[in-house]
């Protein structure tokens, strides 16, 4: 058979496959999310997210060192507060676990990039992402609270703030608020394209942020829409976002690619809790090769255009990649 083109020639050995590989996953692509809680000497596994834990602030310095040793450049900090109220005021309380954890991480590992999650759902008594007017989340009344939260996290030492609330205009408000406080070099990683997804279930258990009524479809995006994603990304860029996020990641790789092609900003994705937990459950039952599935999944996100991948698999993935 006279075949001039034989694509298998470039697959014939591991060395040649490595030589022509188009997408190379690295620990430097990853961000590890951590959950901090009130109390001391706490490291408790989250039941719906095997391998992920709640940490008290006194435990995060050791964790930060382990993360850095694996070559992961950044963490994103989420927290459960000591108290909740109607407006989520513990979100900007400098004595809350998130602010204290940020400070502890920066003291222990100054070179580790710390991202602060800016939202109110963990902090409000009703579990929604903003201040309520009746049963409606009041967009404009919420913005000052988000600004206060972002500023408090940066005062604690955060390098990047990541508004995940999906209120209109929050990037501009936060940018203005940070600049007014002199934090002109603090980056904003906007959850610009955040869908009202069923893939968040385990996270809401981990963060104790299930809404007490209704859902978040009034402010998070319809999973059926992609043109809206491009609009949201463009609006947040115009408002000053430095990094654009798509969340979730795996079911939205088509969206990731289109946003990547439409913008000159770095793209981040969030490999969310149910994506993680489904893999862990299948692996626990012996149905899949966990390492192979995880690395293939993360590579698909980078191949689609993501420069930054926030993933609960990050610690394991980094260990596998470093072998």
Where on the chain are the PLM-derived regions?
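Alpha/beta enzyme core
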Residues: 2, 13, 25-31, 37-323
